[in-house]
Structures are given as C-alpha cells and as structure tokens.
Design a protein with these regions (language model features):
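ABC ATPase NBD coupling module
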Residues: 66-83, 107-115
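Glycine/charge-rich catalytic "coupling/switch" loops of P-loop NTPases
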Residues: 265-312, 329-330, 334-363
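A short, proline-enriched helix->beta-strand linker immediately N-terminal to the Walker B motif
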Residues: 152-156
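Conserved ABC ATPase "signature" region
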Residues: 64-69, 112-129, 180-181
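Internal alpha/beta loop-helix hairpins
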Residues: 184, 194-264
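Conserved ABC ATPase signature
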Residues: 133-137, 141
C-alpha cells in the first residue's frame, strides 16, 4: 500500500531482544502489537523510530525509505517523520502544556506556533489546561498532552508505546474512546504497542501477536480472535470473537438494543447505545451454549444459526474449541469433549449458538 508504514526488520544478536517482525498499516489504521513483557514490542517501536540502530531489513513510510540495509540506508531519528509517545510520556516539568506543543512546531513560522499549539490542545480536549505544567495534570491529561506534542510535527505515522499503562481502568476506557475518535481525524497510521488485549479489541484494525521477538500470528482482529489454534492468545487474553456491528434499533421501554452484523442480529442491554452507531462487539467463548435444535422456554434473546467450521482440542484444559460460521463472522465456543460426542458436533454440521445478552461485551 502506497500510503502505508511497511516494516520488515531483524535485530542482530547483540540487541536486547532479537526481532523477526513484518508489519503494515495504512492511513487511519491502528496496527496493534500485542505480547507479554519481554516480547520485543518496545524494541520494535524504537527500531521504527531509528533509536535502535542494530537492525537489518527495510522500513518504508509513505514512499520514503527510512531503513534499507541492503542499500546502506538508515535515516537518523530526526529525519523520520513520526510521532512517538513513550510509556513515561517524556514531558518536561518546567514547561506548561502550550509550550510543550509549541516547541514541536519548529517547522512553522514563529508567529503561527502559539495558535497552532492551542488548536492541537483543543483537539485532545486540553484547551483549558494550556498554562498548566505536567505535575498538575492527571495521568490521562498527561497522555493527551504527549499525543498533542507527537502530532504537532505533522508526522506520517504515530507510535504509541503502552499509552494507557499509567491510568486506571475508567480513565483507560475514556482515553480509548478519544483516541478512536482522533484517529479518524488524522490521515496517518498508528502503531500501538500493548500488553492489554482490551486495547486491541477497542482500537485496532489489525494485530500482530509477538512472543520473544517472533510473530505468533498476524491479521485482522476479527480473524485472529476467531482462530481455534491460538492457545497462546487464549491464555493471555481469554477466547472470544471480535467483530463490528451497527446499532440498528434502541428500545427505550425495554432498555434493549439490536446490533446488526452479517450473521444476524444480537439483542443487548441498551446502556448508552444510540441508533446508527457502529460498535465493536466481543462474545466470550465461555458464554456460548451450543444446541442442535431450537430450545423453548428460555430467558435468553440470542439464538444464531450457524455451521461448525473448525474444531480444536485444548489438551491443557480438556475443553474443545468449536468455531462456528455465522454469515461471514466466526464465533468461538468452549465445550467439553462429552458435549461434542453427545451432540455429534463435526465440521460442516448446522449448529445453534445461544448467547446471553448480558454476556456480550460492546465497546
């Protein structure tokens, strides 16, 4: 893709963590890199930024080659048009918010910097904090300031290293929503490193699973979360299918909402959902009950018709992971081996997936 960040990097043996990673992202994409501590996630970002110089391979951003060891090309960090938000945000204690952003606007005439800095602060909802220093800002406000400074350089890619690690869960949710809204206004890809799979579920279009510097799996989030052959991901984040749905209808009287996706309609608690929105949906594998005939007299709303498209036994837990094709979407269900035998579950067999409304996660 011409407007993409494309990465093909190998880190030499003297690097802290050897890497063998390929990654691509287009404008407004969020490419997540997920893995445990020590997987090489930060080393990968530092390699993209030119801060880790023991790399071989190729990095191209919007047609500009940043790294190509075969041709002897390795641009220094200041020549790579990128924004980098580190885990500690890297803020200066003596500067207020406005000056943090203004010093990153050296490419603009001096008389334009203040107004542009104010505009960027407003973009991240910090317009009323322009005169405040980092010590007086909350963790979430510090993160917003770091992002405003990072995008002030008008970068071609934004690199985020565990951007939500220093905030509580409620603040994390709010910042995720803000970043999701912001990415639609930025004509650039975002590479997001995280050890919390909720960040992937709520923000990412694609994910690369990284372990000890090597790619375990990579692809669209919906594709990766619906695979039956990734016990590593199940152990790290729990099994559950992720897909996008539209809020088709909200019933104010019953306090329920209809979510439409290519496999049908799901009924969920309405909460703050509004009609016409697109939302990310996660269905935990443990919350799906399988049936071969339509049951009666149940309280649950959601019965989806599908077909068994995959089976995998988890030797460690003793459960069987069943992949169900519902339209173009694939769900995962965890059942016992006994259930597989009793229901004669086999690839290609029609199956019903029963899901409680309150078990469906909507973000």
């Amino acid at each position: 893709m011409s407007d993409a960040v494309s990465i093909d990097v190998r880190v030499r043996a003297d690097a802290p963590i050897p890497l063998d990673v390929a990654l691509a992202a287009g404008p407004r994409d969020v490419a997540a890199v997920f893995g445990p501590s020590g997987a090489g996630k930060t080393t990968l970002l530092r390699t993209i930024a030119g801060l880790h110089r023991q790399a071989t391979g190729r990095i191209v951003c919007r047609g500009v080659t940043w790294l190509d060891t075969d041709r002897g090309v390795c641009l220094p960090p200041h020549e790579r048009r990128l924004g980098f938000v580190a885990q500690d945000y890297g803020l200066f204690p003596h500067l207020d918010a406005l000056h943090h952003v203004a010093i990153a606007l050296g490419h603009l005439p001096r008389d334009q910097r203040r107004a542009e800095a104010a505009r960027l602060l407003a973009l991240v909802h910090l317009e009323s904090s322009a005169s405040r220093r980092p010590a007086s800002l909350s963790g979430g406000e510090q993160q917003r300031l770091a992002i405003a400074r990072a995008i002030a350089r008008n970068p071609h890619v934004l690199l985020l290293d565990e951007p939500f690690a220093a905030v509580d869960r409620a603040t994390r949710r709010a910042l995720q929503d803000e970043l999701d809204a912001l990415r639609h206004r930025l004509d650039m890809p975002i590479v997001l490193v995280t050890h919390d799979f909720e960040d992937v579920i709520r923000l990412a279009s694609h994910v690369t699973l990284l372990e000890r510097g090597h790619v375990v799996a990579a692809g669209a989030v919906g594709e990766i979360t619906s695979r039956v052959d990734l016990p590593w991901l199940a152990a790290a984040a729990g099994r559950g299918s992720v897909f996008t749905a539209s809020v088709d209808r909200v019933d104010e009287r019953r306090k329920l909402a209809d979510l439409r996706f290519d496999g049908g309609t799901l009924i969920v608690p309405a909460g703050s959902l509004t009609s016409g929105r697109y939302v990310r949906v996660r269905v935990p594998a443990r919350e799906i009950i399988l049936a071969t005939s339509r049951p009666e007299g149940l309280s649950l709303h959601n019965i989806l018709e599908g077909r068994v498209s995959g089976l995998e036994s988890d030797e460690r837990s003793g459960v069987v992971i069943v992949q169900i094709a519902v339209g173009e979407t694939h769900l995962l269900a965890e059942v016992t081996g006994d259930a597989v035998d009793r229901l004669a579950i086999a690839i290609g067999r029609p199956i019903l997936a029963l899901i409680k409304s309150v078990a469906i996660e909507v973000g």
